[in-house]
Amino acid sequence: MFLAALVFLFVLLMSLPFLVPHLGVLALFGFVPLLCMERVASMEGMKRVWIWHYSAFVLWNAVTTFWVCNATVGGGIFAVLANAFQMSIVFGLFRWSKKLLKGSLPYILLAMLWIAWEKYYLTAAQISWPWLVLGNSFATTVSLAQWYEFTGALGGSLWIWACNLGLFGLMVALSDGSWFRFNAKAKLAAAGGYLAIL
């Protein structure tokens, strides 16, 4: 039940920026519930976790791109399922990398793989599906994304991943007690670094 709540929180936080004007800031911590879900599942040794993250991506795609069904219902359903499958592959590679890499490296790899996938999808793929590029969540919050003229929407995707991973890292440090072993300078650097990203 807890994992389902995290999935629905992820869907809510990541859908609103694409549906409601001026809510792009929600994307800055929208992936945290999905990362928490993955952490809980890993700590519990759960099997078939892909069902949870694939379901999360299907729901997110369905909520934000439901309008494609106005053109063709079959095409809309296929687009939702196929795009969610691709997102799930990226997330699955991240989960697999956690078996090989330790510390923060799998999380950095997750951000890199996601942005590389978005870049491929925008430029080289036969089908372009730019609606759910993470950086596009600020499409109606232009005042926060003036620097997009230099980085494009993928720079926004990097910003979103940096914020999500930074917040998740702070939450993990607090929950496992490592935050309390940091000296004052390390705490100030961690909190200050996260605030600078915001």
Functional labels for PLM-detected ranges:
Residues 1-198:
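Membrane-embedded alpha-helical bundles of multi-pass enzymes
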